[in-house]
Amino acid sequence: GWDDDLSKLVAQYDAMINSAGCKYYIIIGDTDDPYYDAGVGETAWEATLHEAFGEHFINMRLYLIEHGLSDCGLETTFADMEGYCNGEISKQLRADWTHLNAYGYYSKGIGVYKKGVELGYWS
């Protein structure tokens, strides 16, 4: 674990990347609801990972807030909009506060694919 020490978290990611010896990687952000109202901004740990890994980081929570429903052809509800204001992913994409359902994982896959295209890993 990283014991809520963000520098330790970054060091753990760096160790895995260095151990793999691969320059082609994507750091995928968490999809948990934030403990506090994050809105559509980054949480402290998301900002830390974004700063540490730059273009290799995808903020998956924000990706799903911004694109999840449209990726799946779902309509945005009033409840979705209220949740977004608190930084929460639509319940239409979730099994619970941390796990996604089939729609959520489908959209997550699209997000990772798009990030790989952006980084030139595939076309």
Model-derived features: positions:
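Alpha-helical cap/lid subdomain in secreted, periplasmic
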Residues: G1-S123
